[in-house]
């Protein structure tokens, strides 16, 4: 079995945010308990390596019963959604489980093209996150506030635009807010801007 997930920030050789790893534990445990042999696939910056983080990931997940594919973004075919790359990637697996809502909008080989070669399934976290979004979208606009932050305005702006008529107010923070502040003439000093 093959699972797509993002391992998040690390500093000084240590994982600094373990929430995302813990969040996929339910799916991993479910698959392992049913006899699956799991390979986790993820990215960690464009050039980072998982090798120094493997022990920490195993400790967080409470198991060593998986293999960890090296940083998928190191491979040339990944970000261009190369079908030949996806076909090669898929050869060793029987199914594909996506538990990575945060990157599911990307047109990458390990998210899109691979589903042409393996039966795709949603992991428990992905199902939960889609359900949460569905619930928010079904709520009345009145009293609804969207809070959005982080970096990569190119991925956040379509979300903001989509929610303009679905939320009463939108609060923007992080590097996304810095873009709006800078355009408005505010001196953001050395703050991150995307």
Question: What does each of the following model-derived ranges do?
Answer:
Residues 1-194:
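Active-site loop-to-helix "anion-binding N-cap" substructures in soluble metabolic enzymes
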């Amino acid at each position: 079995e093959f699972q797509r997930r993002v391992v998040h920030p690390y500093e000084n050789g240590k994982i600094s945010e373990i929430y995302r790893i813990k969040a996929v534990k339910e799916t991993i445990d479910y698959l392992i308990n049913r006899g699956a042999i799991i390979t986790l696939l993820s990215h960690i910056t464009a050039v980072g390596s998982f090798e120094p983080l493997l022990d920490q990931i195993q400790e967080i997940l409470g198991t060593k019963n998986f293999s960890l594919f090296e940083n998928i973004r190191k491979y040339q075919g990944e970000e261009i959604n190369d079908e030949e790359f996806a076909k090669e990637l898929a050869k060793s697996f029987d199914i594909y489980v996506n538990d990575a809502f945060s990157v599911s909008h990307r047109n990458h080989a390990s998210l899109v093209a691979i589903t042409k070669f393996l039966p795709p399934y949603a992991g428990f976290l992905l199902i939960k996150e889609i359900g949460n979004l569905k619930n928010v979208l079904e709520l009345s606009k009145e009293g609804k506030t969207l809070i959005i932050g982080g970096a990569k305005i190119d991925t956040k702006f379509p979300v903001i635009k989509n929610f303009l008529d679905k939320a009463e107010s939108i609060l923007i923070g992080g590097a996304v807010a810095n873009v709006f502040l800078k355009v408005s003439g505010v001196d953001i000093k050395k703050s991150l801007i995307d």
